[in-house]
Amino acid sequence: STSGSISEPFSLPAAISEQAKQEYGQATDQERRAVRSEGNVRRLQKVFGRMAEGGEVTVAYLGGSITEGYLVNSKQNYAYKTTDWLKELFANDNIRRVNAGLSGTSSTIGLLRVQKDVLDEKPDLVFIEFAVNDANDITSKLMYESLVNRIVNSETAPAVVLIFTVLENGYTCEEHQAKVGEAYGLPMISVNAALSPEMESGALVWSDYAQDEA
């Protein structure tokens, strides 16, 4: 089953320090552009509330080489950095990271792997990243939606965030994957939206963002 978007704005739990709230509120234009949609934040608010209370929370990351951290130090991939940021933001060392990124794999392979590599870990929050590994064909679209459906409706009812990356040549499956996110009311992050203005103006070059085309 899908869930529609809600209108109330996203807010951090009251238990978070004022300093952390101020830091969150000082997002750059680039960071604001990256948020394609806040979606339905109820599950995310619940997870963040547990983090703020110091509870044990499992955050899983499923995707391709960008998630795995191909060509970068293991502490430099976004899964590692995001988990560390959450630990710092919520002053909670009980946040566990499960990095299920695997280079060169699409959402079709992700669907085959998701039970063992993600759902068996009982995640509370799942990030999905397959925008540059999937194809823009009907099979890939169906597999991606099946993967999202499987995770959203899994036993732990995790919060799910979709991440849309982009290749140096502009290739991305963001548009068709975003339609799935809209149908399920999911928060969505767009790397392309974050980077494009700076890339077009020359303020950034691709090597500032990535060591390879992805």
Residue ranges and their predicted role:
Residues 1-60, 67-74, 87-93, 200-203, ...:
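N-terminal secretory targeting modules
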Residues 60-63, 163:
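Short hydrophobic segments within beta-strands
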Residues 65-68, 132-134:
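A short, flexible beta-alpha/helix-coil linker loop
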